[in-house]
């Protein structure tokens, strides 16, 4: 019990808690005093009903804060431990009397009841800001973690403005009245671009009501009435362009601090090796700067990424709960692009589709609103069609029929097989699927948006047979594993009103919201265990734009993520942002560019799993493909392709190009 109490005491550090201003309990935490009073009245651990009744009555005049209510179980445990301490101290070393023994038994039973009790519903019922927020559609439709985001935001604004949480929520509702779009959402004032306006409104109201009593009815645990630093100074929100400039300067200074001593040491080493040659020292210094620049920048970024969480806490992405299923308004297609080379590859693709379907069964009995498709191509060939390929397509259709008969008999088909025919590519001199994976996804987006199926030689069963069009497209690789619940969370994030893309003044890039939401990618334990090499690279975080470390950093700092090819796409918004922006036969690695044009978010709390190469050669081929693709993004920094590329996107592209030479630079610096 003492260990539990000590752990709970740590939670007291995350915020200021009101204390009583006068009386016998002056200076004591209000929630702790009230919890002890309740335990004394009940003669032991109070039941959930007693807790609700007691604190409801108290809150008629003096509402508790969200933090106080969340700490009620901890305060009740603390109160019982104080009672236990009093019993032990008064008994001394002698035997316990009958009365004290009974009291001790009651306290121990009370501690056990507190451990076993479920306070979640009690905490929800007692939270007055939560009751008020329940009237907001965006709050009530959100999942529990997102609702906690709203409540935490209200508590932080309350601390910052010295207004009560009830006042913060009331003012957020007032600001949302009579508005349309995002600004009609209460969450916009609490979590998004409406927050500065809310803070200004609360401070203006505070000036008008100066001299009235604090809504909490309790003073803050400070010795004076002086305002804190965060209240004295207005918080200036930097633009992403300013953040990029500051980070670039900071990285340059860090790299210089690391590189200058190394260059000086190299110069002295050169003088020692070539004492007769006056240029030896200079050459050693120049070579050290050239080959040490990339390692120094890598180290600077590593330091920067390590320090950033200290200054800026990551903000999770809001999500809908989707308690009743996806619904037709959020109709989603899950697509797996594959290369069909044999009968085995067809069967593996069907098995992958079945696994994704089964992983989605946690939130909808018939998975209403979500469908699954194999997006297939044949390998490049000197011929438009080859012998045996028609049989592979027929096998795929048979397997799709089998899946539909097993999982959706009598209903509309949920599984589909789409296959593109080869077209001649004059640049490569072969027949191939247009633009490979990018072209396949682009064709599927057109099909899902307006029923255009002209690129597909096989569309079985017809994916456009329903009047309703798909709203979202989830793209996964053939070796991607989607855990149970991941699809629901992805769709919930994409469908949340605060994440829906908003285009202002006819722009092609969203000003608010996101066209793509990319999950966190991790290596599967099976692929990591295949070889020592796979185990070694499965945990790499490095400087590549597709790595977890870089994705976390970009999201925490710029509130934009990196798209690595897996994620959920808002179909209409993506087509508006990306269509016509990437010329054909120019880009091999297109995911980063698409994320830049369409504005991608990063859902760090939604994890999908991917396989890793088990040997050096496949890994090196993948790195070589990524390197070529990254270098092909260089033209997007200049006209005419840079339309829609902002400062953050330029930083991402330059970062990847810089990281592409990291391995060579590290090796050269090591040899030097």
Briefly describe each language-model feature range.
Residues 4-15, 40, 44, 60, ...:
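Conserved helix-loop functional segments at active or binding sites
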Residues 73-87, 234-304, 519-523, 563, ...:
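Alpha-helical bilayer-embedded segments of polytopic membrane proteins, i.e.
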Residues 24-69, 76-92:
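Active-site activation/catalytic loop segments of kinase-like enzymes and analogous catalytic loops
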Residues 302-319:
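Transmembrane-cytosolic junction motif
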């Amino acid at each position: 019990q003492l260990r539990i109490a000590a752990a709970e005491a740590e939670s007291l550090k995350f915020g200021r808690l009101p204390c009583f201003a006068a009386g016998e309990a002056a200076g004591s935490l209000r929630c702790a005093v009230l919890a002890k009073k309740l335990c004394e009245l009940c003669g032991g651990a109070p039941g959930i009903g007693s807790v609700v009744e007691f604190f409801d009555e108290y809150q008629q005049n003096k509402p508790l804060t969200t933090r106080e209510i969340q700490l009620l179980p901890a305060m009740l445990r603390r109160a019982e431990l104080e009672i236990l301490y009093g019993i032990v101290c008064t008994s001394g070393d002698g035997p316990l009397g009958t009365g004290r023994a009974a009291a001790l038994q009651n306290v121990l039973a009370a501690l056990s009841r507190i451990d076993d009790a479920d306070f979640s519903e009690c905490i929800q019922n007692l939270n007055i800001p939560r009751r008020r927020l329940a009237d907001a559609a965006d709050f009530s439709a959100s999942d529990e973690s997102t609702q906690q985001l709203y409540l935490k935001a209200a508590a932080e604004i309350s601390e910052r403005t010295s207004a009560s949480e009830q006042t913060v929520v009331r003012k957020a509702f007032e600001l949302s009245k009579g508005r349309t779009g995002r600004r009609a959402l209460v969450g916009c004032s609490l979590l998004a671009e409406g927050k500065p306006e809310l803070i200004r409104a609360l401070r203006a109201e505070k000036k008008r009501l100066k001299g009235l009593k604090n809504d909490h009815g309790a003073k803050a645990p400070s010795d004076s009435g002086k305002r804190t630093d965060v209240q004295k100074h207005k918080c200036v929100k930097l633009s992403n362009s300013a953040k990029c400039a500051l980070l670039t300067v900071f990285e340059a200074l860090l790299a210089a601090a690391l590189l200058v001593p190394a260059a000086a040491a190299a110069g002295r080493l050169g003088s020692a090796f070539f004492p007769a040659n006056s240029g030896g020292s200079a050459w050693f210094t120049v070579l050290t700067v050239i080959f040490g620049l990339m390692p120094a920048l890598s180290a600077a970024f590593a330091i920067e990424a390590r320090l950033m969480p200290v200054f800026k806490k990551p903000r999770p992405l809001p999500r809908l709960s989707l308690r009743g299923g996806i619904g037709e308004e959020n109709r989603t297609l899950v697509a797996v692009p594959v290369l069909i080379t044999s009968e085995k590859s067809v069967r593996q693709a069907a098995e992958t589709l079945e696994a994704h379907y089964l992983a989605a069964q946690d939130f909808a009995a018939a998975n209403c609103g979500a469908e699954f498709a194999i997006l297939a191509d044949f390998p490049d060939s000197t011929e438009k069609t080859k012998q045996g390929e028609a049989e592979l397509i027929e096998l795929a259709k048979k397997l799709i029929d089998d899946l539909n008969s097993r999982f959706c008999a009598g209903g509309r088909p949920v599984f589909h097989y789409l296959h593109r025919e080869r077209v001649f590519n004059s640049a490569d001199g072969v027949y191939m699927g247009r633009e490979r994976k990018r072209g396949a996804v682009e064709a599927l987006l057109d099909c899902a948006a307006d029923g255009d199926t002209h690129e597909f030689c096989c569309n079985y069963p017809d994916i456009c047979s329903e009047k309703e069009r798909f709203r979202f497209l989830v793209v996964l690789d053939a070796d991607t594993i989607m855990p149970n619940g991941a699809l629901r969370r992805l769709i919930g994030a994409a469908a949340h009103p605060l994440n829906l893309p908003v285009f202002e003044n006819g722009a092609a890039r969203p000003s608010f919201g996101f066209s793509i939401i990319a999950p966190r990618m991790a290596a599967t334990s099976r692929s990591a265990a295949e070889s020592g090499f796979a185990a070694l690279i499965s945990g790499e975080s490095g400087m590549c734009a597709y790595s977890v470390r870089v994705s976390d950093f970009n999201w925490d700092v710029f509130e934009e993520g990196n798209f690595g090819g897996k994620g959920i796409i808002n179909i209409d918004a993506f087509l508006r942002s990306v269509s016509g922006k990437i010329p054909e036969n120019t880009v091999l690695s297109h995911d980063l560019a698409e994320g830049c044009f369409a504005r991608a978010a990063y859902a760090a709390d939604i994890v999908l799993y991917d396989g890793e190469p088990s040997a050096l050669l496949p890994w090196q081929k993948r790195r070589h493909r990524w390197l070529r693709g990254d270098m092909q993004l260089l033209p997007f920094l200049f006209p005419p392709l840079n339309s829609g590329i902002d400062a953050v996107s330029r930083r991402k592209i330059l970062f990847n190009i810089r990281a592409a030479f990291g391995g060579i630079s590290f090796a050269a610096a090591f040899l030097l």
